[in-house]
Amino acid sequence: MNNEGSAVINEDDDTSLLVVILDCNVYSWGNREKSLQDAISGMNDDNDSSSRYNGSTTIGNNNNNNNNNNSNNNNNVNKRLINTSKNNYIGFNKFLEHFMVFINAYLMLNQENQLAIICSKIGESSFVFPQSNIDQYQQEQQELEQRQLNENGELLPTPNKTIQGQILAKLQKLDLEIKHDQTDILSSSFSASMSIALCYINRIKRETPTIKPRILVFNISPDVSSQYISVMNCIFSSQKQSIPVDSCILSQSDSTFLQQASHLTSGIYLKPQKQELLSQYLLTTFLLDTLSRKSLAYPTLKSVDYRASCFCHKRIVDIGYVCSVCLSIFCGHSSSCSTCGTKFSLKIDLRKQLNNNPTTTTSATSTVNNKS
């Protein structure tokens, strides 16, 4: 009887594991900071020019009043544009402030909640929290050297003892230098981050089978079509293990990969309209666990972009050729499948039709000659 009662309690346990994937692409965040600074500098230049214009002497009071009114109207328009850009987009430092509010609220829901943060950088991914044993030992040694005494001769506590201090200290030590031998220099390793997150969840579930895991992705970089296969494998793995993938899009354009991930895994896909209010979006949307989502209403996708990436050139295609054996997708016709090696034969009438109308493409038009 005791075992049955404990099993019921474990099933109703709301302990959750949240694995956060942060997009720390230096180029994407750098372009965001540059655009915000350019908008502010443009506003200052307009104010300087209008002030110099108003200080000059003109003939005719009517003309002077009209010019002043026009300059004031332009300033008001520029101010509205600056305020709109500030509300719609935020920088990395401001994002961390909103993110820390969300993390503290998540940990306050249940003292047994577990947290993991993975940083997706250029060409590699690494854990930000929890720290490894080596990093923790090195940090403790540095803290012992840097700790100071108070007036009573007692050691002062270090700020890195808190979770927030550990996360901020780790983010400050991130190596954001560019490696020239990389093929996709400007792209983040999102597929690697997803793989690390799934492996970490699998290890934690072995230790705590009743824990409820989910993944939250903060994305600001555009999709990389060359990572399509690996990303889709991670999405299907999450779907099979019933791990929701939530997506918070901070970029201007939507993410095709994350739309499919959130839709297939029953996660939440959200693109905040006003990023200045990001804390409210996070607390009211992404703070919901898997049990609460069954009883509460949350944002859902109206339409999902299911376009795939071709296996030959890694480009997003609307219509293409599909191998009926291994389901590989190609943007153009070929004599054989580069994935499984199956030979194709295209019908003559269809080939003539394609030659007469080269702009028309078809999907799954090839017939397969299986080798005996």
Curated annotation (Swiss-Prot):
Polar residues bias: start-end ranges: 50-60
Taxonomic source organism: Dictyostelium discoideum (Social amoeba)
Compartments reported by the entry: Nucleus
Annotated region (Disordered), positions in chain: 40-78
UniProt GO cellular component terms: transcription factor TFIIH core complex; transcription factor TFIIH holo complex
Feature: compositional bias, Low complexity: 61-78
Keyword Nucleotide-binding: no
Principal location listed in the UniProt entry: nucleus
One annotated GO biological process: nucleotide-excision repair
Protein name: General transcription factor IIH subunit 3
Positions annotated as zinc finger (C4-type): 323-340
Purpose: Component of the general transcription and DNA repair factor IIH (TFIIH) core complex, which is involved in general and transcription-coupled nucleotide excision repair (NER) of damaged DNA and, when complexed to CAK, in RNA transcription by RNA polymerase II. In NER, TFIIH acts by opening DNA around the lesion to allow the excision of the damaged oligonucleotide and its replacement by a new DNA fragment. In transcription, TFIIH has an essential role in transcription initiation.
Family the entry assigns: Belongs to the TFB4 family.
Gene Ontology molecular function, alphabetical: zinc ion binding
UniProt xrefs under Gene3D superfamilies: von Willebrand factor, type A domain
Keywords associated with the record: DNA damage, DNA repair, Metal-binding, Nucleus, Transcription, Transcription regulation, Zinc, Zinc-finger
Subunit text: Component of the 7-subunit TFIIH core complex composed of XPB/repB, XPD/repD, gtf2h1, gtf2h2, gtf2h3, gtf2h4 and gtf2h5, which is active in NER. The core complex associates with the 3-subunit CDK-activating kinase (CAK) module composed of cycH/cyclin H, cdk7 and mnat1 to form the 10-subunit holoenzyme (holo-TFIIH) active in transcription.
